Amino acid sequence: MLSEVLLVSAPGKVILHGEHAVVHGKVALAVALNLRTFLVLRPQSNGKVSLNLPNVGIKQVWDVATLQLLDTGFLEQGDVPAPTLEQLEKLKKVAGLPRDCVGNEGLSLLAFLYLYLAICRKQRTLPSLDIMVWSELPPGAGLGSSAAYSVCVAAALLTACEEVTNPLKDRGSIGSWPEEDLKSINKWAYEGERVIHGNPSGVDNSVSTWGGALRYQQGKMSSLKRLPALQILLTNTKVPRSTKALVAGVRSRLIKFPEIMAPLLTSIDAISLECERVLGEMAAAPVPEQYLVLEELMDMNQHHLNALGVGHASLDQLCQVTAAHGLHSKLTGAGGGGCGITLLKPGLERAKVEAAKQALTGCGFDCWETSIGAPGVSMHSATSIEDPVRQALGL
């Protein structure tokens, strides 16, 4: 068991192209978003495990002795045990959560407890730890915040228990794990995601683990080997929506108008494939014209998504406001509100970006200037992170 303080971060994600079409067997491109979740793990000797989630105002403390008495025999299934309903009911009792706990805050506690017991049970005694998780990602906005959380928890616990290597053992300021360790972190993070979401696709945790960009189709994932650095505006309309209802709406429209809807889905697939091709070219030899192609693809995809029925007045407003400043946007994720992305090509006048941000904020939206294709899960020294993050984590 390591005795030092560990500081880990993992990125969120956005869907660049292919949302909704992916449900019907088409390609989706998911990219790591450089808004990150940070976790600091401090070993303790007070016989307690504490989890502090300041973004949602939760602090929970458990007695190690009580957790030690738990029959963790139920975790003995194979290498990475999948959580069963029976196990989750037992853990809810220990966590002091109501049986019908479905809120993300409660499920975050449950996912932590599950990963802590499952990963640390190989230690002679369960370790005393103080863990704080703070995120730049807004929760419930379709940006992979729960996956970034699960990836951070899995990476920190596996490193602390010496199940994976410590990337900073040679005193660097930032590091990542070797491929085998990343696979292990990803497997455990997926189980954390299962506690929170039931039956996730695995895309969010994979993007958060490896970073960069992933192509996903019918359960198969592959990494886009090279990715140019792309700057974006990410805008949260803050309009709540139900992903389930939006997916069901597309399905019923497909049944009602198969001759119209099937070609739309095929076109969206072609947009994803063209974007993948252009990104590959840009990574090898970037020319300004390629950004114009990316902008056109975003416009076309946005119109297709409106035709599928997953648009929203707030997203139309976002696209109109950015278009007035010569920028190109599309929804990302489920649609019906939620978030949109706007491409910022190199050499864009600063004043134009600021004016667009101001106009979006004036609509009541939240707006971030960030990048996509970000690094995956990383270990940091305290000096390698920015002051606001350090302060939020109490470092």
From Swiss-Prot:
The active site is at residues 146, 204. Its main location: cytoplasm. It catalyses: (R)-mevalonate + ATP = (R)-5-phosphomevalonate + ADP + H(+). InterPro entries: GHMP_kinase_C_dom, GHMP_kinase_C_sf, GHMP_kinase_N_dom, GHMP_knse_ATP-bd_CS, Mev_gal_kin, Ribosomal_Su5_D2-typ_SF, Ribsml_uS5_D2-typ_fold_subgr. Its cofactor is Mg(2+). It is found in: Cytoplasm; Peroxisome. It is an enzyme of class 2 (transferase). GO terms for cellular component: cytoplasm; cytosol; peroxisome. Belongs to the GHMP kinase family. Mevalonate kinase subfamily. The keyword Lipid biosynthesis applies. NCBIfam families: mevalon_kin. Keywords: ATP-binding, Cholesterol biosynthesis, Cholesterol metabolism, Cytoplasm, Kinase, Lipid biosynthesis, Lipid metabolism, Magnesium, Metal-binding, Nucleotide-binding, Peroxisome, Steroid biosynthesis, Steroid metabolism, Sterol biosynthesis, Sterol metabolism, Transferase. The authors of PubMed:14730012 identify two forms of Mvk in rat liver, one form localizes to the cytosol and the other form to the peroxisome, whereas according to the authors of PubMed:14730012 the protein is found only in the cytoplasm with no evidence for its peroxisomal localization. This is Mevalonate kinase. PROSITE patterns: GHMP_KINASES_ATP. ATP binds at residues 13, 55, 104, 108, 135, 140-146.
